[in-house]
């Protein structure tokens, strides 16, 4: 039972890690269709893509504030590049920390396989999963708050061409990954409790067996010992308690 739960946690952690990685690698965190220029515009944490009227799909990316910090890019001619904001880059870096904690939880599982009697690897795995889930949920909430602000909610093409952005499939993929992390945390806590209970049961059985063995060897007759020492031990043995005499009451 405990081993099955442990492998279920492993599978859920891998699924959550891959879902979060897929969300980070795709640009559809905010999506808008600009009818004036007939383009779908997708804005991610580090990647922004748009479709041209001729069907061409072009993307721009940023890893620093100096890459694309203006609304138009002089380096790319002929099409508009969505602006990147510092909070997007910050959330991306924080998300990478969450993924690092998920990797540490997987490493803790590998350690727990080789040290089955130790509780520490499983406890560390639970702690790393909690940290990964908390950071993931925090980033999702922060993105929802920022994307709802007026400054980052609309895509401006012209004075009259203002279009509202909506959360895209990348955000929902990341949300699914965060909930899978949450399920893995619940199973991880259950696994730690099961391991603690099994450990206590094993220790109690060992104590009982050692006590019985010590009592057996204490009163066992050894032919190498003298008869007098055996008789002395037999005479000094603990006697059972005297049974109580029940008073009989006669009813007339």
Curated annotation (Swiss-Prot):
It holds the Pfam family Clc-like. It is a multi-pass membrane protein. The chain crosses the membrane at residues 7-29, 91-111, 127-147, 173-193. Keywords: Membrane, Transmembrane, Transmembrane helix. The keyword Transmembrane applies. One of its GO terms (biological process) is epithelial cell-cell adhesion. InterPro entries: Claudin_CS, Clc_prot-like, PMP-22/EMP/MP20-like. The keyword rRNA-binding does not apply. GO terms for cellular component: membrane; plasma membrane. It is found in: Membrane. Its main location: membrane. Belongs to the Clc family. This is Clc-like protein 2. The gene is clc-2.
């Amino acid at each position: 039972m405990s081993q099955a739960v442990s492998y279920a946690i492993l599978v859920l952690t891998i699924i959550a890690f891959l879902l979060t990685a897929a969300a980070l690698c795709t640009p559809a965190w905010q999506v808008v269709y600009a009818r004036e220029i007939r383009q779908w515009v997708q804005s991610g944490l580090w990647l922004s893509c748009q479709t041209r009227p001729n069907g061409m799909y072009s993307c721009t990316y940023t890893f620093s504030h100096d890459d694309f910090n203006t609304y138009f890019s002089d380096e790319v001619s002929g099409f508009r590049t969505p602006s990147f904001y510092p909070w997007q880059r910050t959330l991306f870096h924080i998300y990478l920390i969450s993924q690092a904690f998920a990797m540490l939880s997987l490493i803790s599982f590998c350690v727990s396989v080789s040290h089955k009697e130790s509780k520490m690897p499983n406890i560390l795995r639970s702690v790393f999963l909690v940290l990964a889930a908390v950071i993931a949920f925090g980033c999702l909430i922060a993105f929802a708050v920022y994307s709802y602000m007026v400054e980052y909610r609309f895509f401006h093409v012209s004075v009259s061409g203002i279009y509202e952005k909506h959360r895209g499939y990348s955000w929902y993929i990341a949300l699914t990954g965060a909930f899978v992390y949450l399920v893995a945390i619940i199973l991880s806590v259950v696994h730690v409790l099961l391991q603690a209970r099994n450990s206590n049961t094993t220790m109690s059985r060992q104590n009982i067996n050692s006590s019985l063995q010590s009592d057996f060897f204490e009163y066992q007759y050894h032919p190498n010992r003298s008869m007098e020492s055996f008789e002395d031990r037999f005479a000094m043995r603990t006697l059972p308690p005297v049974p109580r005499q029940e008073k009989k009451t006669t009813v007339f």
